[in-house]
Amino acid sequence: MAFDKLGRFFGISNDDELANDEEYTTQNEENNEDLPLNSINRDNVVSIKSGLNSSKSKIVLYEPRVYSDAKDVAQNLLNNKAVVINFSRMEDSSARRIVDFITGTVYTLNGEIQRIGDKIFLATPPKFVTDGKISDLVDKKDNLS
C-alpha cells in the first residue's frame, strides 16, 4: 500500500506497469515470429564423441611384385588412404610403369606423390598434408624417375 502511494507520487501505477509488461511481451513475440524455430546455427556445435568416432586417416604399405598390383594402390587412394609403395622387389621397368599409373591417379584426385627413399614412394589423396623434405637422405642415383 505504501508503494502504491509512492508510485502514484511519481506517476507510476499498477495499471501502467501491466501495460508496459504487455507491450514488452508483444514486442518479444513479434521478434520471435521473424526467426524460424531452427534458426540456431548447429554447425558451431561439435560433439566430442563424433570427433572420437570419426573415420581415422590410414596409411597403407605396399610392395608390388607385378603391374596389376597398381590397381590395389589406386583403389586405396580413391578410398582416401595414403599409400607407401616399396619397389625394391620389382624390376625397374615395371616399377616405372606403376609409378606412371599412380601419378595419373594422384593427379586426377588432386593428391601428391613423393619419392621418400630409394625405390620408395608416398602417394597421398588430397586430404593428407605432407610437410618437410627428405631428399638429402635419398641417394642421388635416379632409378625410377
Curated annotation (Swiss-Prot):
Give an example GO cellular component term for this record: cytoplasm
Its chief place of residence is cytoplasm
Determine the domain of life of the protein's source. Bacteria
Q: Coiled coil where?
A: none
Q: Does the keyword Cell division apply?
A: yes
Entry's localization field: Cytoplasm
On assembly, the entry states: Homodimer. Interacts with FtsZ.
In which family does this protein belong, per the annotation? Belongs to the SepF family.
| Role summary | Cell division protein that is part of the divisome complex and is recruited early to the Z-ring. Probably stimulates Z-ring formation, perhaps through the cross-linking of FtsZ protofilaments. Its function overlaps with FtsA.
Designated name of the protein: Cell division protein SepF
